[in-house]
Amino acid sequence: MKPRVFVTREIPERGLSKIEEHFELDLWKDEAPPSKKVIIERVKDCDALVSLLTDPIDAEVFEAAPKLRIVAQYAVGYDNIDVKEATKRGIYVTNTPGVLTETTADFAFALLMAAARRVVEADRYVREGKWKVAWHPMMMLGYDVYGRTLGIVGMGRIGAAVARRAKGFGMRILYYDSIRREDFEKELGVEYVPLEKLLEESDFVSLHVPLTEETYHMIGEEQLRRMKRTAILVNTSRGKVVDQKALYKALKEGWIAGAGLDVFEQEPIPPDDPLLKLENVVLAPHAASASHETRSRMAEMVAENLIAFKRGEIPPNLVNQEVVKVRPPGFQ
């Protein structure tokens, strides 16, 4: 008999078909995510769970699923999962790292470019019939990107990928990280500086850190006031890394020139959020990894993690390595 898995959203077929070869599949097909109540109900008899960032997976869910042995996250981040509790219960947690790196870096740079050159504003300007003069020397003035200074906060895989793109634009690249990356300094010519100096000297600041107690609201009023009035902030990491109220104030009052945001403190962003009324911010619906190729590869990685576990092997992308001491891999 195949082990049973609940998949909380319809993911690309390349992954689903592989999962279905090895598991009895229970798939949530609604576009809206299942509520926690629904997850608890559907996972009761499951051996495995495929989750997304919008799914709260905690002790209450684990308690309702005595057979649950693995949670395969369809994402790199996993702050929606109580990993400590999972480990205590001998539940393996996996994710999909690496595969998102290049497409997320593409998107971060796209937000940077769109905000700097006012691309979205210009599009609306044309569509709304406001373009009355063929050309005007002061129309839609933005900021150059080539040759400017980029500050990267978080020099991991994605931060380094953004740096590689910035090199092609002849940019000076500063970075701040909790760990100094001398390997990237040699490879990419990036310069390690304290966060304060990075904020003060950068024309663009791009955030690439995980959400932890240390990074929660690491960009707040104090940090935003340190930035240049002509600077642009880009966030493709986690919404709560930035104090959104302080950011609104900074954009509204002109402490900084603009922002490009793919993530927010509350997702979806409420329709009455004041950020939506500002012209100097480019907004996206947590879509940095949203390419056909990347999302399909993510689905395949989820399947690979599940299938390896079923074979009694340690999954290739295991988050909580210490769980191996609690329970060996497999559905035995």
UniProtKB/Swiss-Prot annotation:
The keyword Oxidoreductase applies. Homodimer. It comes from Korarchaeum cryptofilum (strain OPF8). It comes from the Archaea. Its EC number is 1.1.1.26. The active site is at R238, E267, H286. It is found in: Cytoplasm. Gene3D superfamilies: NAD(P)-binding Rossmann-like Domain. HAMAP family: GyaR. CDD domains: GDH. It is an enzyme of class 1 (oxidoreductase). Pfam families: 2-Hacid_dh, 2-Hacid_dh_C. Its main location: cytoplasm. Belongs to the D-isomer specific 2-hydroxyacid dehydrogenase family. GyaR subfamily. This is Glyoxylate reductase. The keyword Cell membrane does not apply.
